[in-house]
């Protein structure tokens, strides 16, 4: 009579979950938080801690902390390896594809350039990433209004911060952070002379808004209005 083969002692041992492996699983599942979001998360946790005896205060604090953790998430991204690619500088939905003069404060002239605008909702990741590899040759902040960022006039009227990047081949791409109705705080960590790699994080807009990308003359966008973008990964166009 045939017998079922027995497993050896070494193979019958149950796999163990070490603390290091558990930590690696958590890190791969939960994206890190951008440093700018930590004070907001801490404030929510503080409210929950101070009011832990009151259910409404505890829940409100925990919900606020969780929402801020989602808003300020900083997920890892893998930029394309294709030479000459221009990637989306922000998560969101493409709301405008047109031609427009670059921001006047950059002194690049008034000749229209191809422009791709991305609208960020409060549910999108707030961080912005370099659309190309190159050197930061100009950073200019301009005060303005805080109108709804999905309106066409937002690019001209709202507060904005422009970063001009020059690639190794001399092509220039401009990424403009535009404030909005809810987003009233632009953070830019890029400075003139910095060398950025495509997909590097250089700033954020608190609680959504808009990102305008001005492309070199002759560039043809390969995206469409209404398309969702992933910062650092979605290709907007190729350098001419």
Swiss-Prot record:
Pathway: Phospholipid metabolism; phosphatidylethanolamine biosynthesis; phosphatidylethanolamine from CDP-diacylglycerol: step 2/2. Its cofactor is pyruvate. It is a peripheral membrane protein. The active site is at 209 (schiff-base intermediate with substrate). Is synthesized initially as an inactive proenzyme. Formation of the active enzyme involves a self-maturation process in which the active site pyruvoyl group is generated from an internal serine residue via an autocatalytic post-translational modification. Two non-identical subunits are generated from the proenzyme in this reaction, and the pyruvate is formed at the N-terminus of the alpha chain, which is derived from the carboxyl end of the proenzyme. Coiled coil: none annotated. It comes from the Bacteria. It is an enzyme of class 4 (lyase). Keywords: Cell membrane, Decarboxylase, Lipid biosynthesis, Lipid metabolism, Lyase, Membrane, Phospholipid biosynthesis, Phospholipid metabolism, Pyruvate, Zymogen. InterPro entries: PS_Dcarbxylase, PSD-A. It catalyses: a 1,2-diacyl-sn-glycero-3-phospho-L-serine + H(+) = a 1,2-diacyl-sn-glycero-3-phosphoethanolamine + CO2. GO terms for biological process: phosphatidylethanolamine biosynthetic process. It is found in: Cell membrane. Its EC number is 4.1.1.65. The modification Pyruvic acid (Ser) is found at residue 209. Binds 1 pyruvoyl group covalently per subunit. GO terms for cellular component: plasma membrane. GO terms for molecular function: phosphatidylserine decarboxylase activity. Heterodimer of a large membrane-associated beta subunit and a small pyruvoyl-containing alpha subunit. NCBIfam families: PRK05305.1-3. Catalyzes the formation of phosphatidylethanolamine (PtdEtn) from phosphatidylserine (PtdSer). Belongs to the phosphatidylserine decarboxylase family. PSD-A subfamily. This is Phosphatidylserine decarboxylase proenzyme.
């Amino acid at each position: 009579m045939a017998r079922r083969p027995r497993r050896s002692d070494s193979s019958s041992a149950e796999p163990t979950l070490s603390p290091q492996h558990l930590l690696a699983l958590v890190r791969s599942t939960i994206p890190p938080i951008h440093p700018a979001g930590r004070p907001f998360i801490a404030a929510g946790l503080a409210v929950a801690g101070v009011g832990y005896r009151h259910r409404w205060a505890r829940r409100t604090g925990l919900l606020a902390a969780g929402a801020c953790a989602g808003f300020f998430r900083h997920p890892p991204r893998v930029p394309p390896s294709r030479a000459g690619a221009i990637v989306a500088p922000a998560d969101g939905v493409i709301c405008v594809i047109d031609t427009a003069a670059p921001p006047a404060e950059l002194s690049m002239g008034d000749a229209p350039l191809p422009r791709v605008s991305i609208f960020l909702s409060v549910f999108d990741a707030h961080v912005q990433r370099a659309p190309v590899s190159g050197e930061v040759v100009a950073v200019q902040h301009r005060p303005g209004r805080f109108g709804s960022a999905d309106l066409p006039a937002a690019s001209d009227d709202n507060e904005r911060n422009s970063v001009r990047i020059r690639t190794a081949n001399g092509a220039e791409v401009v990424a403009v952070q535009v404030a909005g109705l809810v987003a009233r705080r632009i953070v830019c960590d890029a400075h003139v002379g910095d060398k950025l790699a495509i997909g590097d994080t250089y700033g954020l807009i608190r609680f959504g808004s808009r990102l305008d990308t001005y492309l070199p003359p002759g560039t043809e966008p390969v995206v469409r209005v209404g398309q969702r973008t992933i910062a650092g990964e979605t290709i907007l166009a190729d350098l001419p």
